[in-house]
C-alpha cells in the first residue's frame, strides 16, 4: 500500500462540501469524509472502490 494511505483525512482549506473517501489506518478500511475542495493530501478518493483498490488491496 502507498505511504500516503497512512495520512489522516484532511478536509482542506476551502468551503466546498465534496463527498470523498480516505483510508483509515486504525479502522483498516475506507471511510467517507467531506472534502473542502482545495489543499488536503493524497489520501483522498472520489469513490470507495478507488480507495479500496489503492489502499486495501
Swiss-Prot record:
Q: Name one GO cellular component term.
A: extracellular space
**Record flagged with keyword Transcription regulation:** no
Show the disulfide pairing.
5-55, 14-38, 30-51
Q: Which GO terms describe its molecular function?
A: serine-type endopeptidase inhibitor activity
Site feature (Reactive bond for trypsin) residues: 15-16
> What tissues has this protein been observed in?
Expressed by the venom gland.
Where is each BPTI/Kunitz inhibitor domain found? 5-55
Localization recorded for this chain is: Secreted
Q: Which Pfam families match?
A: Kunitz_BPTI
| UniProtKB keywords | Disulfide bond, Protease inhibitor, Secreted, Serine protease inhibitor
Extract the Gene3D superfamilies matched here.
Answer: Pancreatic trypsin inhibitor Kunitz domain
What protein family does this chain belong to? Belongs to the venom Kunitz-type family.
Q: What does this protein do?
A: Serine protease inhibitor.
Q: What is this protein called?
A: Kunitz-type serine protease inhibitor 2
The top of its lineage is: Eukaryota, Metazoa, Chordata, Craniata, Vertebrata
Amino acid at each position: 500500500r502507498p505511504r500516503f494511505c497512512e495520512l489522516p483525512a484532511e478536509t482542506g482549506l476551502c468551503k466546498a462540501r465534496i463527498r470523498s473517501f480516505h483510508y483509515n489506518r486504525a479502522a483498516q478500511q475506507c471511510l467517507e469524509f467531506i472534502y473542502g475542495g482545495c489543499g488536503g493530501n493524497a489520501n483522498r478518493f472520489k469513490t470507495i472502490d478507488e480507495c479500496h483498490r489503492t489502499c486495501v488491496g
